[in-house]
Amino acid sequence: MNNRIIFATGNAGKIKEIQMIMADTGMEVLSMKEAGISIDVEENGNTYEENALIKARAVAAQTDCLVMADDSGLEIDYLNKEPGIYSARYLGEDTSYRIKNQNLIDRLEGVPDEKRTARFVCAIAAILPNGQELTARATIEGRIGYEEKGENGFGYDPIFYVPQFGKTTAELSEEEKNQVSHRGKALEIMKEELKKYEGNHC
């Protein structure tokens, strides 16, 4: 029996982050590509949890392994929690994050620090080989910066300022990011849940 998790993503940066967080479980984290699964899933849910489950169910139909998926987004309070669940599709899926980030900075022009509050939200879904579904959610609070800073992250990381570290999530070391990241927190919650179902994987 292989202790494998197939994570429903093709994002190499995300897989690297997940592998680090899950390293102490002894389970091998594979991307869809590494598992030989190629599907295109329409994320049409109304919540992060629904979108994560849609992805996980689609991949689970192709394998007998434990499958996990996530959906995450950036919520900016001043912009009525935009881009929210549409974060990946904001301004179009093929639009670079440099353009997306600059657009959000431009929309917040003249807005003072105290009104630039924002959070990253992450929901993780897991589907066990027996079909049981689990979800976990976590957030990280911060605010939107005035320019992109940092090279360590991806997506909206360069504009998301974390007050407790005094820098953006793209400026954090991998260790620092895993301490506070929304995905890291959600994975820790999910890891605790999965301990109840040890052995229920491929």
Stretches found by the model and what they are:
Residues 2-6, 12-202:
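Anionic-ligand binding patches
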